[in-house]
């Protein structure tokens, strides 16, 4: 029996039967696994129950959808261990990160959390190599030392109450190979959430952002982050990021334009 660590992993999910099993199996050292489902209609519940029946320390519960940040905050509040780790259903800890966990949890009191590297799976290539840099995300937090910003509709993250460090090795492996048809639907959804969030916070459209942000986004991902190392698959990934940046900026502009100008029917009535 592998000794358990004082760690709660928390996962939000909806119809994740195809991915959740691998995620759970990478959390074998966690003393607790909290899974919050928002109404799955596939075999997610049966899959989770099979792990519970096999003795996994899983707490499975239903909670109506609160938005990404709200749902993760609810899941975080259910955790009972001294440390809490957020992981998505389509992610799993690689071997190096699993082996590093005891060291991270033994950090001095001044460290309240850890940022972790993430390596996505690219169709036609595989997982990006470790020298391809993706922004590290704060995933590991001491219980009671961080909360989600509920104003964030997408790309939500934990706001820590103290110092955080970067895990020196190991990665979260992100496996959800979406073909371009599916990827565009995802980018459209996320850019809508981001644009709505920006407009609600008072963000105004900027001409230069609409023109320059998409190519700058591509160049940053492809050259600075190193996606050029992944061949054509890396090019597609970087270009998809640029599309997301363009859609977000364009939607911010159009939302403001519709508020500032009368619609066609109003103009014709005068």
UniProtKB/Swiss-Prot annotation:
Any one GO biological process: lipopolysaccharide core region biosynthetic process
A single Gene Ontology molecular function, please? glycosyltransferase activity
Q: Which UniProt keywords apply?
A: Glycosyltransferase, Lipopolysaccharide biosynthesis, Transferase
Q: Does the keyword Transferase apply?
A: yes
| Membrane-spanning intervals of the chain | none
**Record's family?**
Belongs to the glycosyltransferase 2 family. WaaE/KdtX subfamily.
Q: What is this protein called?
A: Lipopolysaccharide core biosynthesis glycosyltransferase LpsC
């Amino acid at each position: 029996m592998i000794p358990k660590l004082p760690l709660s992993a928390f996962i939000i999910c909806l119809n994740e039967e195809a991915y959740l099993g691998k995620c759970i199996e990478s959390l074998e050292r966690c003393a607790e696994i909290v899974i919050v489902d928002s109404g799955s209609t596939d075999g997610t519940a049966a899959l989770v129950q099979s792990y519970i029946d096999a003795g996994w320390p899983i707490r499975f519960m239903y909670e109506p959808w609160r938005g990404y940040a709200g749902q993760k905050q609810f899941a975080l509040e259910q955790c009972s261990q001294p440390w809490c780790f957020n992981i998505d259903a389509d992610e799993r800890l690689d071997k190096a990160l699993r082996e590093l966990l005891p060291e991270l949890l033994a950090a001095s009191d001044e460290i309240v959390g850890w940022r972790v590297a993430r390596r996505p799976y690219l169709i036609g290539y595989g997982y990006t190599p470790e020298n391809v840099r993706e922004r590290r995300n704060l995933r590991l937090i001491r219980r009671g030392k961080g909360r989600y910003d509920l104003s964030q509709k997408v790309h939500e993250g934990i706001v820590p109450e103290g110092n955080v460090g970067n895990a020196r090795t190991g990665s979260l492996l992100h496996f959800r190979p979406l073909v371009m048809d599916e990827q565009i639907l995802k980018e459209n959804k996320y850019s809508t959430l981001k644009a709505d969030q920006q407009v609600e916070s008072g963000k105004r459209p900027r001409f230069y952002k609409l023109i320059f942000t998409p190519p700058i986004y591509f160049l940053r991902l492809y050259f600075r982050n190193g996606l050029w190392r992944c061949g054509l698959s890396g090019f597609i990934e970087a270009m998809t990021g640029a599309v997301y940046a363009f859609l977000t900026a364009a939607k911010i502009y159009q939302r403001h334009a519709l508020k500032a100008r009368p619609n066609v029917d109003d103009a014709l009535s005068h």
